[in-house]
């Protein structure tokens, strides 16, 4: 089976072609970072308009790169949600229209399921069951995964997600958009400076996350300290360590609760070097395994949508003719794949 994947949930237009026998045949991506940089964040209306401009040329390029004609496709997968409704509808309209015109089945994919399954694109793909840590700009959650569509959300953000906390803290430090990667780069220059940042919600049972208080603590620390480059780097390091430690503590709890020894990290924040190193050390000490996608598949992309959609299309699942976008969509409401 060969599937065209379309991702437009936020500020990246991602198109890919995936074949269940040959693997990933093509992967094209357009990022709107420069478009939104002047505003310090994603402007939904501008994002939607840019998706409209870029999506068809990218589809043509992806099909050309994959040496694939319309007749070679067995289905089309597009991101249905969660995300920005205008951006979602661009991908949904184009995907559903192509499916109708080409007489192909179509499937609306859950964006976070795409991230969750992204490590399956690697040669050392994880086997079920495992615990997944999904960390991005809009989501932080721990999921018990027993199979595709067999998900139990063990804990999630009650306010700011980890990626959102990175971006907002970067803005407090005067760093340019996108803030998260820039903050991590600054943190790499930091030194242990005796800051005692809190590890939110680790002093109580449970697997939920909360990073808004940590962001406020960081803002107060910035205001109280000298405004020089090394001090800012030290604060960035202390903030990053607090976020990473919090995520690691919760992951350890989730593994103990489930009895599983495999951990998947996915989503934009999974590209963070300190997070990868910390969780790799933790899993090594526990005698377990950790899996994550390559860097280009940590952020939003069409490859993960093509792969996730193919799994459901193979199981006979598909959408009706209606064009739908779901800006809010609980992961654990998805049907299982038999």
UniProtKB/Swiss-Prot annotation:
Cellular component terms (Gene Ontology): cytoplasm
GO biological process terms on file: tRNA threonylcarbamoyladenosine modification
Cofactor or coenzyme needed: Fe(2+)
The EC number(s) this enzyme carries: 2.3.1.234
GO molecular function: iron ion binding; N(6)-L-threonylcarbamoyladenine synthase activity
Gene3D superfamilies recorded: 3.30.420.40
InterPro entries per UniProt: ATPase_NBD (IPR043129), Gcp-like_dom (IPR000905), KAE1/TsaD (IPR017861), Peptidase_M22_CS (IPR017860), TsaD (IPR022450)
Catalytic activity: L-threonylcarbamoyladenylate + adenosine(37) in tRNA = N(6)-L-threonylcarbamoyladenosine(37) in tRNA + AMP + H(+)
Positions of substrate binding: 134-138, 167, 180, 272
Residues reported in the UniProt entry to bind Fe cation: 111, 115, 300
Subcellular location: Cytoplasm
One Pfam family here: TsaD
Sequence similarity: Belongs to the KAE1 / TsaD family.
PANTHER family given in the database record: TRNA N6-ADENOSINE THREONYLCARBAMOYLTRANSFERASE, TRNA N6-ADENOSINE THREONYLCARBAMOYLTRANSFERASE, MITOCHONDRIAL
Protein name: tRNA N6-adenosine threonylcarbamoyltransferase
The organism of origin for this protein: Shewanella baltica (strain OS185)
């Amino acid at each position: 089976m060969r599937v065209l994947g379309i991702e437009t949930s936020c500020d990246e237009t991602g198109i890919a072609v995936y074949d269940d026998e040959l693997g990933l045949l093509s992967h094209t991506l357009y990022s709107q970072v420069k478009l939104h940089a002047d505003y310090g964040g994603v402007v939904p209306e501008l994002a939607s308009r840019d998706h409209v401009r870029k999506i068809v040329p990218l589809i043509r390029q992806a099909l050309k790169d994959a040496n694939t004609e319309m007749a070679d496709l067995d289905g089309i997968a597009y991101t249905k949600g969660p995300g920005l409704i205008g951006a979602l509808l661009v991908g949904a309209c184009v995907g559903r229209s192509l499916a109708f015109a080409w007489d192909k089945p179509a499937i609306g994919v859950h964006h976070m399921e795409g991230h969750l399954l992204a490590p399956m694109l690697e040669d050392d793909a994880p086997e079920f069951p495992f615990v997944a840590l999904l960390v991005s700009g809009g989501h932080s959650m721990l999921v018990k995964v027993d199979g595709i569509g067999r998900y139990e959300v063990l804990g999630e953000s009650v306010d700011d997600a980890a990626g959102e906390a990175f971006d907002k803290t970067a803005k407090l430090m005067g760093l340019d958009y996108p803030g998260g990667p820039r903050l991590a780069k600054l943190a790499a220059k930091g030194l242990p400076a005796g800051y005692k940042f809190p590890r939110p919600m680790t002093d109580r049972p449970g697997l939920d996350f909360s990073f808004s208080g940590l962001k406020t603590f960081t803002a107060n620390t910035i205001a109280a300290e000298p405004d020089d480059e090394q001090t800012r780097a030290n604060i960035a390091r202390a903030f990053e360590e607090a976020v990473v430690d919090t995520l690691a503590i919760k992951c350890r709890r989730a593994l103990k609760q489930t009895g599983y020894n495999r951990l998947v990290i996915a989503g934009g924040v999974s590209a963070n070097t300190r997070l990868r190193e910390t969780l790799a050390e933790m899993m090594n000490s526990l005698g377990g395994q950790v899996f994550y996608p390559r860097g280009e598949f940590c952020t939003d992309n069409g490859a993960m949508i093509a792969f996730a959609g193919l799994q459901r299309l193979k199981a006979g699942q598909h959408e009706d003719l209606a064009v739908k976008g779901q800006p809010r969509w609980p992961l654990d409401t998805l049907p299982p794949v038999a």
